[in-house]
Amino acid sequence: MTLMEDAKKGVITPEIEAVAKAEGIDAEIVRSCVAKGLVAIPKNARRDTLPVGIGKYMSTKINANVGTSRDCIDIDAEIEKAKAAEAFGAHAVMDLSTGGDLDEIRTRILKAVNIPVGTVPIYQAAASRKIVVEMSSDDMFNAVRKHAEQGVDFVTVHAGVNLNSLERLRQSDRIMNVVSRGGSFTLAWMLHNGEDNPFYAEFDYLLEIAKEYDMTLSLGDGMRPGCIADASDRPKFMEFITLGELVKRSREANVQTFVEGPGHVPLNEIELSVRGMKELCDGAPLYLLGPLVTDIAPGFDHITGAIGGAVAGMHGTDFLCMVTPSEHLALPSIEDIKEGLLVTKLAAHTIDLIKEGPRERAWKQDTAMAYARRDLDWEKQFELAIDGDRARKIRDARKTESDACSMCGELCAVKIVKEAFGEKKEEE
């Protein structure tokens, strides 16, 4: 029996209880949201790991991508990245490996972290053949089953990419066409074989596998726009419509889902994308990479992604995939992972400040920082800071004899007003 089945029957499972406790809300609220598909708790029945709630009333969660490429194969380094991601605050890790022994990398990551682990099975299916288009539908489904058997908690499947998507793409004026790796594999396969996407055509079989292992489906955004000029076009929204239909079928099969999107999007179109996704997908949890709000920032795309993520959070995003400074340039290093996670944590916190559910706890953190700043309590500020070590290093590098910072010293506004109020009270 899956977690969603239990929730529909009114059962508050240990996973639901754990999420409720972590989020500080009533377990019945969590159960109801899981039953309706508004919250997902990605946890494979074969894996004993920390339950993490994603969706309505939940604090905003963060995923970190790790994994080899065919040009950079260092398995130990990727394991260390996964561990570092968990240590730096990621709530989930995805193994996107395409080079080396994919089974070894995946099993080692599953053992190395105590948070949900996701994968993209089509990468392994493609690796089993010399050419991507030569993989069979059996290769695709066998890869999904293998990952499920090994304990993977959620898998990205680009089931919304189908022959209809292909036709929309042909009729579009896109500059970047398709930038999703899994989406490009799928489109190339359909064109070569003259058949529809097996993950779409045989979606019921995919649901059978997911249900057997209580594995969550992350419905991938294979048609996401890869540049600002392509944002909010027909291929993108056509996929959202299809994904919404697949969300409904998944819920009927008692399989948990969340939905990925929406690519590169200018600030003024983020609300349209996110609200559109939420509406078309019946409130399913949304999992976004970014969105990236400009195309001219290689080396700084962790910042463009955090800006987009924060704005998207105002309109319903639940799960942010961190972007690193290496995006569009290279495989990320551990330092890139840390930097990407920190700016994404900032974006997530700004979302939580206004999100129903985590809002009260987030406000307490900011209020505590306000009091610490008012009191010039530096140790408390470092304790509350999102990266206290960095804050301490900056202050220590340019210290002043004043108890204020070296920017203002004795001219510190907080210090002046504090002393002025103190003198007034003494006179009174």
Curated annotation (Swiss-Prot):
Domain of life: Archaea
Pfam family name, one: ThiC_Rad_SAM
One GO BP annotation of this record: thiamine diphosphate biosynthetic process
Enzyme kind, highest EC tier: lyase
EC code(s) of this entry: 4.1.99.17
Binding site residues for [4Fe-4S] cluster: C405, C408, C412
Pathway per the UniProt entry: Cofactor biosynthesis; thiamine diphosphate biosynthesis
UniProt key word Metal-binding: yes
Residues that coordinate or bind Zn(2+): H264, H328
Reactions it catalyzes: 5-amino-1-(5-phospho-beta-D-ribosyl)imidazole + S-adenosyl-L-methionine = 4-amino-2-methyl-5-(phosphooxymethyl)pyrimidine + CO + 5'-deoxyadenosine + formate + L-methionine + 3 H(+)
Record-listed substrate binding positions: N65, M94, Y123, H158, S180, R181, G182, D221, G222, M223, R224, E260, Y287
GO molecular function, one term: 4 iron, 4 sulfur cluster binding
Cofactor(s), by name: [4Fe-4S] cluster
Cofactor binding remark: Binds 1 [4Fe-4S] cluster per subunit. The cluster is coordinated with 3 cysteines and an exchangeable S-adenosyl-L-methionine.
Keywords: 4Fe-4S, Iron, Iron-sulfur, Lyase, Metal-binding, S-adenosyl-L-methionine, Thiamine biosynthesis, Zinc
Keyword Lipid biosynthesis appears in the UniProt entry: no
Function: Catalyzes the synthesis of the hydroxymethylpyrimidine phosphate (HMP-P) moiety of thiamine from aminoimidazole ribotide (AIR) in a radical S-adenosyl-L-methionine (SAM)-dependent reaction.
Entry's family note: Belongs to the ThiC family.
This protein's name: Phosphomethylpyrimidine synthase 1
Classification lineage: Archaea, Methanobacteriati, Methanobacteriota, Stenosarchaea group, Methanomicrobia
Gene name in the database record: thiC1
